[in-house]
Regions:
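Asp-based, Mg2+/Mn2+-dependent phosphohydrolase catalytic module
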Residues: 1-5, 15-19, 36-43, 95, ...
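N-terminal helical cap/lid subdomain that shapes the substrate entry/recognition surface
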Residues: 2-110
Length: 239
């Protein structure tokens, strides 16, 4: 039916709940950064974090209409402002800590492993196209056992662009020499995943889950699952 199956991650394969605003998170980040010599109070740290994130995004918009910043660069600036030099490994540690403390739970949806195994058994190519932070997502892929299933993984923070922008989709198609007519995008975002794929000439499957953004009225998906039941996907796209 299709040769290439392209998946979104969060809200599609992975059910996750995070809270990046809770005081406890920023208290602990403030303490840990202080241990490394970058002394902030909580409000100052959050304010600077938001400021540097916005500045980086604005800088990138000069060359890319759908930019994705790498939050590692935000941490670099936060440490540099206090005169502290840190390694990429230390920044990765801080981002891992931020993610773990802010995450309520993370788990696979029912049926994910079954579908991915079936795709591989049939000789299909499987790809990940995710709007995400590499220092969050790559450890989570390993933790959830998903990494071995993918023939290619594209994460927006590594590429500097994100869905629904054409640049991110074009990077996937060109890097792995994929024919859009032989490919399908599976995701839970009616704009980033479905509209983006439609504009690239790809078929798509929209699955509406609890963490999906509001669905657009003019949904361009080839297939649609509105009740969030991932187990329905196999029969729809592997006939």
């Amino acid at each position: 039916m299709y040769k290439n199956y392209v998946f979104d991650m969060y809200g599609t394969l992975v059910d996750i709940r995070t809270n990046e605003w809770k005081s406890y998170l920023w208290d602990k980040m403030t303490e840990m950064m202080g241990f490394y010599g970058a002394v902030y109070d909580r409000k100052e740290l959050k304010k600077k974090y938001d400021l540097y994130s916005a500045q980086l995004e604005q800088e990138m918009k000069q060359s890319e209409p759908h930019p994705e910043i790498d939050l590692a660069k935000v941490y670099e600036r936060l440490f540099a402002e206090k005169g502290v030099e840190v390694s990429p490994q230390t920044i990765a540690f801080f981002m891992n800590m931020f993610r773990v403390v802010s995450t309520k739970f993370i788990r696979l949806y029912d049926g994910v492993t079954d579908l991915l195994e079936e795709l591989k058994n049939r000789g299909k190519k499987v790809y990940l196209l995710s709007n995400a932070q590499s220092n969050f997502t790559r450890p989570e892929l390993r933790y959830l056992g998903l990494e071995p299933y993918f023939d290619g993984i594209l994460i927006s923070s590594e590429e500097g662009c994100k869905k629904p922008g054409k640049t991110f989709y074009q990077t996937l198609l060109q890097r792995y020499q994929l024919d859009p007519k032989e490919s399908i995008m599976i995701g839970n975002d009616s704009v980033s995943d479905i509209q983006g794929a439609y504009e690239m000439g790809m078929d798509s499957l929209y699955i509406h889950t609890e963490i999906s953004p509001e669905c657009v009225e003019d949904l361009k998906s080839t297939y649609t699952i509105m009740d969030g039941d991932f187990t329905k996907i196999k029969s729809m796209i592997l006939a």
